[in-house]
From Swiss-Prot:
It catalyses: isopentenyl diphosphate + dimethylallyl diphosphate = (2E)-geranyl diphosphate + diphosphate; isopentenyl diphosphate + (2E)-geranyl diphosphate = (2E,6E)-farnesyl diphosphate + diphosphate; isopentenyl diphosphate + (2E,6E)-farnesyl diphosphate = (2E,6E,10E)-geranylgeranyl diphosphate + diphosphate. Mg(2+) 3 binds at D215. This is Geranylgeranyl pyrophosphate synthase 1. Mg(2+) 2 binds at D82, D86. SUPFAM superfamilies: Terpenoid synthases (SSF48576). Belongs to the FPP/GGPP synthase family. PROSITE patterns: POLYPRENYL_SYNTHASE_1, POLYPRENYL_SYNTHASE_2. Keywords: Magnesium, Metal-binding, Transferase. Binds 3 Mg(2+) ions per subunit.
Length: 343
């Protein structure tokens, strides 16, 4: 008898590719970075938006729970990847996951959760949701890819290109949630002609732009944001955010700001100088003006979607929370000597 015939047989589950021996302990290992970040929740604007849109869509609770889980999973997983790609140090006031678990394990955890979320959607037994999921995950990666390209090549995008990127990256997860809800809403699908159904996408696109530009604004001007993510983190990342793009394009011949971005500085005084420069360029006042315009547009879209049904109050409450004048901090960041404060 040769030595190979004496070898123990392979377990049947290994031969057949069964996952019966996949244990909770192994699952926790893979999801470690994901669970770490998930245990420190953010403000969860996405759940609030789902609840507000559901006042119109009336999605069955069982389907809505699946959608909530999927959106939460994707959001947290995308933050894990964002923090790696941006070399961030803090997220929600705690060390980023890749500084705790390592970069490779964090990337794998996030990618794993993307597919776990897809498996969750299969519960709905609706082919349309898989198409929606794929489409918006493609959009998310397109947006992220352009954002990274501009940063890594020190290329200042046009405002239109930036808004397109935001529509793909930030708007993608917002749209994903609402499109999934529409696919699972009996009342929404009751009309036989799809072109006669309410279109919620323009509203959610506006909210995505509003949310991201407000986030850009707060990153450079908000003390609470500084506590959670660090002082003017966008400058340290070398990111072309909305106010930064305005300041650079307001005076293309002045290379001060673009050189500060190139340095990816951690020097607080340099960052405060950059903020003062943007303030003098009118970039913060311009950003506030754009945000007010987006809020006004969103409120108009709420009334159009509601069409007199009286179900838009939750959405208006959310928009009130996102109003820039509620988030505007005065005189937060000033250089140690000289320079203008935020007006």
């Amino acid at each position: 008898m040769d030595k190979f015939s004496q070898s123990p047989p392979l377990r049947d589950d290994l031969v057949r590719g069964s996952s019966l021996n996949w244990t909770k302990e192994k699952e926790n290992i893979l999801k470690g970075p994901f669970n770490y970040l998930e245990s420190h929740p953010g403000k969860d604007i996405r759940s609030q938006l789902i609840a507000a849109f559901n006042a119109w869509l009336d999605v069955p609770e069982e389907s809505l729970n699946v959608i909530r889980r999927v959106v939460a999973m994707l959001h947290t997983a995308s933050l894990l990847i964002d923090d790696v790609e941006d070399n961030s140090q803090l997220r929600r006031g705690i060390p980023v996951a890749h500084n705790v678990f390592g970069t490779a394990q964090t990337i794998n955890s996030a990618n794993y959760v993307y597919f776990c979320a897809l498996k969750e959607l299969a519960i709905l037994n609706n082919p349309a949701v898989i198409q929606i999921y794929t489409e918006e995950l493609v959009n998310l990666h397109r947006g992220q890819g352009m954002d990274l390209f501009w940063r890594d090549t020190l290329t200042c995008p046009s405002e239109d290109d930036y808004l397109e990127m935001v529509g793909n990256k930030t708007g993608g997860l917002f749209r994903l949630a609402i499109k999934l809800m529409c696919a699972e809403s009996p009342s929404h699908n009751a009309h036989p002609d799809p072109f006669q159904r309410n279109d919620y996408v323009p509203l959610v696109n506006t909210i995505g732009l509003l949310f991201q530009i407000l986030d850009d604004y707060k990153n450079l001007s908000d003390t609470i944001y500084t506590q959670n993510k660090g002082l003017c983190e966008d400058l340290t990342e070398g990111k072309f955010s909305f106010p930064i793009i305005h300041a650079i394009r307001a005076d293309p011949g002045n290379l001060v700001l673009i050189n500060i971005l190139k340095q990816k500085t951690t020097d607080d005084e340099v960052k405060k100088y950059a903020v003062a420069y943007m303030d003098r360029a009118g970039s913060f006042s311009y950003t506030r003006k754009v945000l007010r315009g987006l809020t006004k547009k969103a409120l108009t879209q709420v009334d159009e979607v509601d069409a007199g049904r009286g179900r838009g109050e939750q959405m208006k409450t959310i928009l009130e929370k996102l109003r820039v004048d509620r988030n505007h901090q005065r005189g937060v960041l000033t250089p140690a000597a000289g320079g203008a404060s935020i007006a």
